[in-house]
Amino acid sequence: MTRKQTPMTLALCALGLFAASAASALAADAPMAPPKSEINAAVGTGAQFTPPPESAIPDDDFGKMVKLGRDIMLDTPKYAKDFVGNTLSCVNCHTDAGRMAGSAPLWAAYVSYPAYRGKNKKVNTFEERLQGCFKFSQNGKAPPLGSKTLVALESYSYWLSKGLPVDEKVAGRGYPNLPEPQQAPDYVRGQKVYEAKCILCHAANGEGQYVNGETVFPPLWGPKSFNWGAGMGSYKNAAKFIYANMPYGMSYSLSPQEAWDVAYFMDAHERPQDPRWQGSVAATRAKFHDSKFSLYGTKVNGKLLGDIGAPKPR
């Protein structure tokens, strides 16, 4: 039995299954992805860091926990099913199993906590940060502190960060800064970018693509995607991620304006309710989404986003 493959492998396989000729045409027209050294240089000015290869995972009890953490990253609905409420996996936002610079890599996150977070206005441990990912990005519920799921993810993150000094400035942490758009992000322009660059993998209605019930390309909106409380619910965060990582394997092929526009388009669609629901869209926006980068509680194409009632119990 083989474990779930990496996103790149899945992407190549799925493109062959779904649209081989279209994929070939797209690849022929697309600019080549920059080499990894250039990608790293583009996402920070600190020291370069390369996490250890999978072959270096120790063959002992600790190594087993590291491998479980890796597997949770790659197929979260399978290996952490009790805490997941959608079809996303951690690797959808932390590419290359949490290794990729400029894609919020786990090795950079691990050495950055404990840290104060404005999102919940308190100092968070690394485990608490992971809990938030399950609650918002996975639209599920937080695994208990000390649970096997969190211990496995923490072990994997620790192992990836071996050799990286704590709190040292390092290239590739988080998502790269993105220049402010020359024009205000726009739904219509974003839709054009989506149809030209994203629809092949993520489908016409953002529902993603599946093979034998398994997610191959993640849903970007709708009931199976992240909820309104997730970091990607800020189109500024989404734009930074998209610019550095999408289309998959073609980092930095979009212009900054295109990244802003398509992020706006993505976030201008409905998705599961913010679990911090305050009883009304207006109250929830006032407390948690009072930002020009959140479309929650605003009207887009005549639809009040977030007006879907209370969140479903988890």
What would you call each of these model-derived segments?
Residues 2-70, 76, 115-188, 297-314:
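Post-cleavage N-terminal segment of exported redox proteins
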Residues 88, 92, 148, 152-155, ...:
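Amphipathic alpha-helical interaction segments
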Residues 61-97, 181-217, 235:
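Sequence/structural segment immediately N-terminal to covalent heme-attachment motifs in c-type
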Residues 189, 196, 200-201, 206-208, ...:
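C-terminal cap of thioredoxin/glutaredoxin-like
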Residues 91-100, 158, 201-208, 221, ...:
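Detector for the c-type heme attachment site
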Residues 63-68, 72, 100-143, 153, ...:
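Extracytoplasmic electron-transfer domains, predominantly the class I c-type cytochrome c fold
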Residues 273-314:
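A cross-kingdom marker for long, charged
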Residues 78-85, 141-146, 166-170, 250-257, ...:
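Surface-exposed patches in mature extracellular/periplasmic domains of secreted proteins
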